[in-house]
Amino acid sequence: MSRKQLALFEPVLLVQALTDAVKKLSPRAQWRNPVMFVVWAGSVLTTLLTLAMVTGQIAGSALFTGIISLWLWFTVLFANFAEALAEGRSKAQANSLKGVKKTAFARRLRAPRHDAQADNVPAAELRKGDIVLVKAGDIIPCDGEVIEGGASVDESAITGESAPVIRESGGDFASVTGGTRILSDWLVIACSVNPGETFLDRMIAMVEGAQRRKTPNEIALTILLIALTIVFLLATATLWPFSAWGGNAVSVTVLVALLVCLIPTTIGGLLSAIGVAGMSRMLGANVIATSGRAVEAAGDVDVLLLDKTGTITLGNRQASDFIPARGVDERTLADAAQLASLADETPEGRSIVILAKQRFNLRERDVQSLHATFVPFTAQSRMSGINIDNRMIRKGSVDAIRRHVESNGGHFPADVEQNVENVARLGATPLVVVEGAHVLGVIALKDIVKGGIKERFAQLRKMGIKTVMITGDNRLTAAAIAAEAGVDDFLAEATPEAKLALIRQYQAEGRLVAMTGDGTNDAPALAQADVAVAMNSGTQAAKEAGNMVDLDSNPTKLIEVVHIGKQMLMTRGSLTTFSIANDVAKYFAIIPAAFAATYPQLNALNVMGLHSPNSAILSAVIFNALIIIFLIPLALKGVSYKPLSASAMLRRNLWIYGLGGLVVPFIGIKVIDVLLTLLGLA
């Protein structure tokens, strides 16, 4: 991705985040975060108490209460700053996308032909179903499907990838995105959305995320934090009558400070920032998620359905051999295979034409002069071919050709069955060629497993994630490649219906499934999967069915998506552990300071040897505020991610963030206490 990556603390973003943090001090903004709303209410109360003490309306130390009030406001401000900084980074990314949107005119055709009469209209007036003509140098004015023509398109404004891509009518590469530029030739496009509903508009709305909906895990954690806050609020409220009964009532300022230090303000202040940052990191990987729910689901995924071609293998299968049936000349097989592939623009189809040319000097025929009917490949038929001069030539998968032969009254030869098995056992893909009901032989297609993919699958297995390879190959070929790549299972001879059934089967077992897809035939499975990453180069139907879009159109990205999702969940869990653990140190700081005058026995809890009750309370409140600032980089970048099993990950995080949450506050509060004493503020 060539789009500029944002530094963690860009000066411009910092200034904007500080401004937004102050704006978020309003009660309406604070009410959305119940934990921080309690801190905000405490800040208001102590501010009023300070003013009353300064004006002599009530007795008490205005300096002590004022400092407590100031640091409570800082606590709220720092939490606001964390959220504003995360949102600011997302908005900066959105602004870079807004730069792609340009006010332009479009040639709206009166008929769906490139030579039809056209009207120049503003792009904003285009509606779903309108037909437009776009020529070289033009910006595509809307999302849509190419219905005529083919062109080279610069999609760098959307994907960050400088290499142009081909978009043409028919097949899985007919989808175009508004805001991209035509470099050559022309396209006739049927608009698929209304203004404001384009892919670019949805990207911007998602990235800005001003009204981001909370995910299920976030809601559950928020409920837990609210419950803890209510418990500590009730506990704190009961302490005043106890201390008053003992003859030395604790001040309201101290009770507010105690409450703020007891409730989980650290995770409460950072929770929203973690969610926003997770979606921002996903965009940094050039993946657009439609919601935080999709990112969170990626972290919980335990089954990955991976297409073999392009994900597990390099995806450039090349014809390597012609293996004729008994009684058939190899040249005859090569000639028929080349004829069946003349209109096949896939890498496999082109390689068959080239191999026939190299082996037998069979030159490409002029497609137009043949007056032939080409039969395109479909996911249902799983074969393609040509009808020419009363000859019906087909090439395709073994089972598809077998059905074709038997339906035409023929017999599938045993020697071809053996050749198919031999090719498959070597990890190559066998394509069978047939003319009428007469099987001519087998074409071997070789593919190469990507380097390092086996190690990545081993890491996923450690994390408890099952990998399943999806391929249209027969079972023998699929088994050979699956063994070489190290996947846990495979689905051979896959059809759209088989993929959908497999996803439902895993979901019925309580598993969460992730998959990628780019074609219209993938749409049902994408809609069913828990995490569905559609390729940006794919059809509009696929992009609408998925809950994520990969701008790089790289199927391997699914593994990275899962890593980002797990990192977000780990970050949230780690900081929650740290937040709850560091409350323990605050108990040892504040409780002896607040109640030692009433109950001298509590002095035994002052294990840190803090200078005075006032310095102990101030130190705890200041530490409580500062720890939010220190944890902001961790919340935005995410905790260090290592592919481990769930139990190993839990142990690791308990040691680092649980023990760290216990130790760090003891050190921090003691250091702050010493500094306050040296400055004469306690």
Curated annotation (Swiss-Prot):
Active site feature: 307 (4-aspartylphosphate intermediate)
Residue ranges the record marks as coiled coil: none
Reactions accelerated catalytically: K(+)(out) + ATP + H2O = K(+)(in) + ADP + phosphate + H(+)
Entry's localization field: Cell inner membrane
Binding residues for ATP: 344, 348, 377-384, 395
Keywords: ATP-binding, Cell inner membrane, Cell membrane, Ion transport, Magnesium, Membrane, Metal-binding, Nucleotide-binding, Phosphoprotein, Potassium, Potassium transport, Translocase, Transmembrane, Transmembrane helix, Transport
Physiological role: Part of the high-affinity ATP-driven potassium transport (or Kdp) system, which catalyzes the hydrolysis of ATP coupled with the electrogenic transport of potassium into the cytoplasm. This subunit is responsible for energy coupling to the transport system and for the release of the potassium ions to the cytoplasm.
Family that this chain belongs to: Belongs to the cation transport ATPase (P-type) (TC 3.A.3) family. Type IA subfamily.
Record protein name field: Potassium-transporting ATPase ATP-binding subunit
Organism: Salmonella typhimurium (strain LT2 / SGSC1412 / ATCC 700720)
Upper taxonomic lineage: Bacteria, Pseudomonadati, Pseudomonadota, Gammaproteobacteria, Enterobacterales
